[in-house]
Structures are given as C-alpha cells and as structure tokens.
Amino acid sequence: MKQYYIVALIVIATLLLTNCKKAGSGDENPQETFDPTPLELIIPQGFPDMVIPDDNPLTVEGVALGRLLFYDEILSGNDSQSCATCHSQSFAFSDNGKQTSEGIDGIKGDRNAPAVINIGWLPSLFWDGRAKTIEEQALGPVPNPIEMHLEWTDAEI
C-alpha cells in the first residue's frame, strides 16, 4: 500500500512539473487583437449624414458599452447618480421638465439637463455649446462637482 502512494506521488509530481512553464515562455500572446463589429447606422429620410470621427467609429460593442455606462451609477462620487438620473428615458431623455437638475448630494445645478435625443446631429452640446462633439461632452458631467463629482483617476479600472 505504501508503494502505491509513492508511485501516485511520483506520477502527480511528474504531471505538475511537465505542465509548469516559465513566465514569458512565448505561449502567451501579448499582441492579442480585438476586431469590433461595425454598426450600420440607418439614417432616417430627410436627415443629413452624421459626422462620425475616424478615431471613434460606431461599433456594436461600443454602443453596448455606452448604454451600460449611461445607466451605471458607479460613475458618480457616491454611486448615486448615472447619466440617466438627469436624462431619463421615461421623459425623452430629459430631466422631467425640472427647472434645474439635481446632482450629487442633492445639489441643484444652474440649468436643467437638455434632452439627449439625436445628439449626433447637433453642432454643439451643453446649453452654452462648449462641447463640439459627443466625445468632448462625455468628459464634462462626471468630474463636475455639482453633477456627478468623480475624478477620472478614481473612475479608472
């Protein structure tokens, strides 16, 4: 019986040792690529073409990620606000007709949140027009101390 355990230990040790690899042995692929799925945008009749930046093309995966981030409260300083808090889908992605939007910790803003429908065709965003692209606009509310109050360094994974 003792010989059986010794043989079993030798077999197990041999299997373990032959399956061990040195880090950097060449089997891993650090240049793994991801090929996102292009999203075909169907533009309604009468609408002009939408300007889509070359460095940020529409993809199925990008739209899915955007939807998740839009509804995720983790992008606020106390995990209580998402973009959808002030841009409610139930109210045409607006702030339910409120005169001023309420941000983190109940702080009232200076304006209400504009509706975010068909924004791909708008020449500028925010009420004062300071953002010229959707990508530029997305950087504003998260670190804003009245709106979501989360530093980008704290949002990084």
Where are these regions (language model features)?
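N-terminal secretory signal peptides that target proteins for export/translocation
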Residues: 1-2
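Periplasmic c-type cytochrome electron-transfer domains
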Residues: 5, 18-157
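Bacterial N-terminal signal peptides
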Residues: 8-16
